[in-house]
């Protein structure tokens, strides 16, 4: 777990939402274009019904109600017909509103599903470097908080803003129809309101962006604290961790409080300004009507009637209220844009590059051990296949350009490789060679310095050294989790840079110190090593590494469901299942990254025999945690600050009484 100080000093990015975010959101939404069209039509019908109802008030009062006042025997039929028509308008508006809210559900959920699918698909293509440099809790926040804010915007904010704008435009046109002077007065008043609301929204928008960033940061800290709870308790870091969390939570509180304070002010301000406009219009309208001043509308010049005044007052509310609703929804949109920007930032991260062209294929091997025929079924023999036109000449020329011992190592690899007559097939034997390799996670700070070494097919190579010596880095480079800055890594005489990454990794079985099990049965977790493996092959792999007896003691044996990364199993049991997973993959080469470091001594004795069976005939790289596990290695390499300072067998290195001797006798601590 990262220390508290590094967490304390780390600040999330506080940039503004990307201006292209809205365009990208709508590119997803318009995948449902016909539903969107239907939603727009329903919103237009609703706005027209609302404006029509307000206009109808004028006719209802002036044409039907006022003429009946004072009559001894009024005719109610026309009034009832008018009220029925008005009711139909209201019903049309209600049905249209219900329809678009029903339609938006599919658009909303479908859009989010597509975004999550694309985000996860892109995430699967990201290099390991990305996950090593980003908190997992922050990545998870993209799928939870960020998508939830986007959901609210798609289902509520965007359609309601559009509906409000259409309603405001309809109300404006209706007011112009009735009275141009009164409409001008409303517009001037609205411009004043616009500047007030703009100031409020701009303040809230900045804080909503900060809020989303801090939510991701807090989530990342909580996840790391939960994963490291044992470490926190062992070192009595509860108070320090609590203090760091409180500081981050305080930042989130301040950003959220500011964002929501300014966001919640919008509607009260607009509402009260709307009441003020209503009162002013009523006073001015009454004065104009009593003075007998004619009014000017799109229909001509005529006196300001009671019906016209009531319609204008109603329309003014229908004009101001949508503006308030737009202002309020803008705060939600700002939050959604902040979340969407984070989502699209993840989706814009550069994917893992793979310029390799060499693939891994099944072959049938002739009796001479050199003749190869490519087949489409598993044979137990593999070969590297170059693309058409590549007979290996290019890699040979690259090897010839190397100097000194590196050139000698590379040329021997080429000579010893078993290749077909046309040069396109090279038998996979597990011959791995580093030539003048220099690498740093930060190019300016190399972790490995001009490393040259080789592993012959079937050899067991142990990498030992203190923490930070570069042991794990070597294995990261073999499977191309990272690419080297200088030098060359050869696999059966072929540069790993020229091999397609999926094929390269298929040839390597990896057992890590940190075990990851997935929700599912024990059988499913073993089969994860090779998805097309049968149940019998999975059981055979478990027997090979002496895991079968332990699994059969579980409640449902191989069908026991594991949850929460194998909670309920001991660390050693989880490690055993991961070793069986590597066994079922049946890889030509193995990387054991401190594979038995989490297993107690007694359990280690049980699994070691199985591990020996698994390693037979394979090139194996072992990152040593316990030196007792590497005594029978063919070659032991001692690394120190990125340099190979010693190499040889156990007995040879003990006799030298150098660094390995110091590690073995306990004079220097091994990690």
Where would I find each of the regions flagged by the language model?
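Helix-loop-helix
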Residues: 174-188, 262-341, 346-347, 370-415
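Short intracellular "coupling" helices and adjacent cytoplasmic loop segments at the cytosolic face
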Residues: 3-12, 109, 117-141, 145-147, ...
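An intracellular "coupling" helix at the cytosolic face of ABC transporter transmembrane type-1 domains
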Residues: 128-129, 145-154, 158, 162, ...
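Transmembrane helix-loop-helix hairpins at lipid-water interfaces of multipass membrane proteins
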Residues: 36-99, 176-181, 290-306
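Juxtamembrane helix-loop junctions of ABC transporter transmembrane domains
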Residues: 11-18, 41-42, 49-62, 89-136, ...
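Transmembrane helices of ABC transporter permease
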Residues: 31, 35-45, 159-210, 283-304, ...
């Amino acid at each position: 777990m990262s220390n508290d100080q590094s967490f304390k000093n780390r600040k999330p990015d506080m940039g503004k939402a990307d201006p292209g975010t809205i365009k990208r959101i709508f590119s997803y939404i318009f995948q449902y274009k016909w539903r969107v069209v239907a939603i727009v039509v329903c919103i237009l019908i609703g706005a027209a019904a609302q404006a029509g109802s307000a206009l109808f008030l004028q006719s209802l009062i002036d044409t039907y109600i006022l003429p009946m006042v004072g009559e001894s025997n009024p005719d109610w039929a026309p009034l009832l017909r008018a009220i029925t028509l008005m009711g139909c308008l209201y019903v049309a508006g209600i049905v249209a509103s219900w329809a678009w809210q029903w339609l938006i559900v599919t658009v909303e959920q479908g859009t989010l599903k597509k975004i999550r699918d694309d985000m996860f698909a892109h995430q699967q293509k990201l290099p390991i470097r990305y996950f090593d440099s980003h908190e997992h809790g922050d990545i998870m926040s993209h799928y939870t908080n960020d998508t939830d804010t986007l959901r609210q915007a798609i289902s509520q904010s965007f359609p309601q803003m559009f509906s409000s704008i259409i309603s405001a435009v309809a109300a404006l046109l209706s007011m112009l129809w009735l009275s141009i002077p009164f409409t001008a007065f409303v517009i001037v008043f609205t411009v004043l309101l616009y500047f007030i609301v703009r100031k409020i929204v701009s303040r809230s928008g900045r804080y909503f962006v900060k809020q989303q960033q801090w939510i991701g940061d807090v989530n990342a800290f909580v996840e790391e604290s939960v994963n490291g709870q044992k470490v926190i308790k062992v070192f009595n870091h509860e108070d320090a961790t609590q203090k760091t969390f409180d500081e981050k939570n305080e930042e989130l509180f301040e950003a959220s409080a500011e964002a929501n304070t300014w966001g919640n002010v919008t509607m009260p301000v607009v509402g009260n300004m709307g009441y003020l406009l209503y009162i002013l219009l009523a006073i001015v309208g009454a004065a104009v009507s009593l003075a007998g001043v004619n009014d000017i509308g799109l229909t001509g010049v005529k006196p300001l009637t009671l019906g016209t005044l009531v319609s204008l007052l109603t329309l003014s509310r229908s004009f101001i209220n949508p503006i308030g609703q737009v202002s309020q929804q803008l705060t939600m949109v700002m939050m959604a844009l902040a979340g969407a920007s984070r989502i699209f930032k993840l989706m814009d991260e550069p994917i893992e590059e793979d310029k390799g062209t060499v693939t891994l294929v099944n072959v049938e091997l002739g009796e001479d051990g050199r003749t190869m025929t490519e087949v489409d079924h598993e044979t137990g023999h593999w070969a590297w296949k170059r693309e058409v036109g590549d007979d290996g000449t290019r890699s040979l020329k690259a090897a010839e350009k190397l100097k000194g011992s590196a050139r000698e190592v590379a040329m021997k690899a080429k000579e010893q490789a078993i290749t077909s007559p046309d040069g396109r097939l090279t038998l996979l034997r597990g011959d791995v060679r580093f030539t003048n390799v220099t690498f740093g996670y930060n190019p300016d700070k190399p972790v490995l310095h001009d490393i040259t070494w080789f592993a012959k097919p079937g050899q067991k190579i142990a990498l030992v050294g203190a923490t930070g010596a570069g042991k794990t880095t070597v294995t990261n480079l073999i499977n191309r989790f990272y690419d080297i800055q200088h030098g060359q890594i050869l696999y059966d005489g072929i540069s790993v840079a020229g091999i397609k990454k999926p094929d390269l990794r298929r040839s390597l079985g990896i057992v890590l110190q940190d075990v990851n099990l997935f929700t599912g049965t024990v059988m499913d977790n073993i089969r994860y090593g090779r998805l097309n493996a049968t149940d019998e092959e999975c059981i055979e792999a478990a027997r090979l590494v002496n895991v079968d007896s332990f699994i059969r003691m579980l409640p449902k044996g191989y069908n026991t469901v594991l949850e929460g990364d194998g909670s309920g199993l001991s660390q050693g049991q989880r490690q055993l299942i991961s070793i069986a997973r590597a066994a079922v993959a049946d890889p030509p080469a193995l990387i054991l990254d401190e594979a038995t470091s989490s297993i107690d001594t007694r359990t280690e004795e049980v699994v070691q025999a199985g591990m020996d069976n698994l390693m037979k005939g394979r090139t194996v790289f072992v990152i040593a945690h316990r030196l007792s596990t590497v005594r029978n290695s063919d070659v032991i390499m001692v690394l120190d600050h990125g340099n190979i300072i010693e190499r040889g067998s156990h007995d040879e290195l003990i006799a030298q009484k150098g660094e390995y001797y110091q590690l073995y006798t306990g004079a220097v601590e091994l990690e």
